[in-house]
Amino acid sequence: MNVAIEAMLYNNKNYASHHKTNELISTWKQHLSSWDKFNSVPRLFIKYEDMLDNTKKILLHIINFINSLTNLSIKKNNDFLENILNTTSFNYLQLLEKNIGFNEATNNSLFFRKGISNQWKTVLSQNQKDLMQNELEIPMKQLGYLV
């Protein structure tokens, strides 16, 4: 866990991807900041916690965002929405990963593990939490993770 936290906080490296090209892996703070400052492209910022709290409302928000940028005019009938909600639910994706795999998973653990919010508060040691909060205080407050 310490290695993952250090990578999230301090690493800014190029890694060879499975496509055999180098990919820049920036810190979490840099990643967030780059999207925040990228004003030339419309973007929609959604937190995982918000999706958990009101999935259907967030789905409608996503559809409205896509419709505002395209000529697709995605219909929002109940059957269509329920199909999206069912096939993108955490439990469904977790089942798919167990049955057929998932490219983003590591060899040692599943990608879709628990699907709960704020798990970092119970999983990380106090030292790890303090380190993250000290390094990421401003963005964590902006996102509502700290008060």
Regions found by a protein language model. Give the residues of each.
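Short His/Asp/Glu-rich catalytic/ion-coordination signatures at enzyme active sites or charged loops
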Residues: 110, 114-124
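PAPS-dependent sulfotransferase catalytic domain
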Residues: 1-111, 126, 130, 137-138
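C-terminal helix/juxtamembrane-tail motif
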Residues: 139-147
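Generic N-terminal initiation segments characterized by hydrophobic and/or small/turn-forming residues
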Residues: 121, 133, 137-140
